C-alpha cells in the first residue's frame, strides 16, 4: 500500500518562493510513488496586506496535480473544513509549511486539531520568524508552532530559533534543495540576451527575485560603484530583475548618483515562470548579497542552472552540503569592498569557475523527501 501524504502550502498558480518550493516538493513525492494530496489556499492574503501587485502567476496556465484549494487563513470555518478533510483522508503523514506569522491563528488551530486527533505531522520551517519581523512575531510563532513537535529546517540558524520557540522540539536539518530549471524552452546565452536586450559582449551578473531590504541590493550597488571607481566595470553589466517590495526610489537614486546607469539594467516587475528561464540563461554569474535571512530560493534556482554564484556569508551555511557547492564564492555580508573583490574573481577565473548543471538537483529533492519520511522521527 502506498504511503499517504497530505502536503499543506501554496502551489501554482500562486507565485513566489514558497509556492515554487511546495510545487517542486509535491512533484517529487508523486515521482516517488506516494499517494499525495496537496491542500492549498482558497485565498492567501487580503489585497491590502500583500506587498506585490498580485499573488498569482497565470502566465503559462500550469497547475499542480492532486490539489484541493480549500484552506484560508482568513476564515475559521475553512480551518475546520480543512482539518475534517485531512482526517477523512487518513494520511500517514501531514506536512505543513511555515514561513509567516500571518498564518499563526489558522496554523495554531490546524496543528492543535491534528495533534489531538493523533495524526503524525511535520512542519517544514522556511523562516521561524519573518525576515523583517517585530517582537509580536516571536509570540505569534510560539503560539502557532507550540502545537507541533516535529520540524524540518533547512538552515542551522532556524534550528536554533525553533529550539527557543518550542520546548522539546524534534528537529531535522535537510539543506534547501536545488531547483530544477524552469520547464521552458532551452535557448543559448546569445538568444537569451537578445531576447532581454542585453549586451552580448559583457559579463552579466544577475540579481533576481522580489526586492526587499534584507536581500542586499544596496550592498551590490555599493560594490558596483567601487568597481566603477577602480575602472574595473567596463566588462560588466548587472541585471536587477524583480518586483520591488521595498522603496524603489532609493535604489534608482543610488544608481544615478553613482554614475553606473550604463552598467545596471533594471527590470522592475515580477518575472513570470515562463520568462524566468531566459534571465538565468542570459547570465554569467549570480549574486545573492543578503544582509539577513535564512536561505535563498533564487540562489537555488541559479545553482539549478549551473551558474557560478557569489553569496553573502549570512546565507551560506547550508550550501556546503549541497552538490555543485564548489561553484560558490562567499563574501562577508554587508561588506561591499569584499563583494567587489569577489566579482573581480569571477572575471579573472572565467576559465576555471565555469557554470555547469550535472543533474544533481533531482537528488537534493529526493533527499528532502527521504528526510521527511524518517519514520522514527514521526513515531511509527
PLM segments and residue spans:
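N-terminal strand-loop element at the rim of the active site
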Residues: 11-15, 27-88, 158, 163, ...
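Glycosyltransferase donor-sugar binding loop
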Residues: 41-45, 237-250, 269
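Nucleotide-activated donor-binding/catalytic signature segment of Leloir-type glycosyltransferases, i.e.
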Residues: 70, 249-270, 325
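Donor nucleotide-sugar binding/catalytic pocket of nucleotide-sugar-dependent glycosyltransferases
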Residues: 146-187, 373
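Conserved donor-binding/catalytic core segment of Leloir-type glycosyltransferases
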Residues: 198-215, 221-224, 239
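Acidic donor-binding loop of glycosyltransferase active sites
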Residues: 278-294, 307
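Short hydrophobic beta-strand element within catalytic cores of glycosyltransferases
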Residues: 308-313
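A charged, aromatic-enriched C-terminal amphipathic alpha-helix characteristic of glycosyltransferases
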Residues: 348-379
Amino acid at each position: 500500500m502506498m504511503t499517504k501524504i497530505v502536503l499543506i502550502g501554496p502551489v501554482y498558480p500562486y507565485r513566489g518562493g514558497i509556492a515554487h518550493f511546495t510545487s517542486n516538493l509535491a512533484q517529487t513525492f508523486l515521482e516517488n510513488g506516494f499517494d499525495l494530496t496537496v491542500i492549498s489556499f482558497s485565498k492567501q492574503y487580503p489585497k491590502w496586506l500583500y506587498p506585490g501587485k498580485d499573488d498569482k502567476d497565470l502566465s503559462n496556465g500550469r497547475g499542480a496535480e492532486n490539489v484541493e484549494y480549500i484552506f484560508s487563513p482568513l476564515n475559521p470555518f475553512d480551518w475546520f473544513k480543512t482539518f475534517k478533510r485531512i482526517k477523512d483522508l487518513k494520511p500517514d503523514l501531514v506536512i505543513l509549511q511555515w514561513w509567516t506569522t500571518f498564518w499563526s491563528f489558522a496554523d495554531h488551530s490546524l496543528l492543535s486539531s491534528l495533534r489531538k486527533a493523533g495524526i503524525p505531522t511535520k512542519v517544514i520551517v522556511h523562516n521561524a520568524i519573518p525576515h523583517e519581523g517585530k517582537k509580536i512575531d516571536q509570540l505569534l510563532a510560539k503560539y502557532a508552532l507550540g502545537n507541533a513537535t516535529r520540524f524540518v529546517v533547512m538552515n542551522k540558524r532556524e534550528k536554533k530559533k525553533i529550539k527557543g520557540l518550542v520546548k522539546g522540539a524534534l528537529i531535522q536539518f535537510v539543506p534547501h534543495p536545488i531547483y530544477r530549471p524552469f520547464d521552458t524552452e532551452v535557448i543559448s546565452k546569445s538568444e537569451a540576451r537578445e531576447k532581454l536586450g542585453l549586451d552580448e559582449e559583457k559579463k552579466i551578473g544577475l540579481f533576481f527575485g522580489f526586492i526587499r531590504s534584507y536581500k542586499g541590493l544596496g550592498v551590490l550597488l555599493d560594490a558596483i560603484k567601487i568597481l566603477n571607481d577602480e575602472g574595473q566595470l567596463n566588462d560588466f553589466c548587472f541585471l536587477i530583475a524583480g518586483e520591488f517590495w521595498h522603496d524603489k526610489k532609493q535604489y534608482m537614486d543610488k544608481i544615478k548618483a553613482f554614475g553606473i546607469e550604463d552598467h545596471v539594467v533594471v527590470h522592475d516587475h515580477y518575472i513570470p515562470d515562463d520568462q524566468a528561464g531566459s534571465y538565468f540563461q542570459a547570465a554569467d554569474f549570480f549574486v545573492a548579497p543578503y544582509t539577513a535571512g535564512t536561505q535563498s530560493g533564487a540562489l537555488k534556482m541559479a545553482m539549478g542552472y549551473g551558474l557560478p554564484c557569489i553569496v553573502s556569508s549570512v546565507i551560506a551555511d547550508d550550501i556546503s552540503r549541497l552538490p555543485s557547492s564548489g561553484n560558490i564564492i562567499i563574501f562577508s555580508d554587508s561588506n561591499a569592498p569584499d563583494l567587489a573583490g569577489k566579482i573581480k574573481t569571477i572575471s579573472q577565473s572565467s576559465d576555471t569557475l565555469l557554470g555547469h548543471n550535472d543533474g544533481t538537483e533531482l537528488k537534493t529533492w529526493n533527499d528532502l523527501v527521504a528526510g521527511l519520511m524518517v519514520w522514527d522521527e514521526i513515531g511509527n
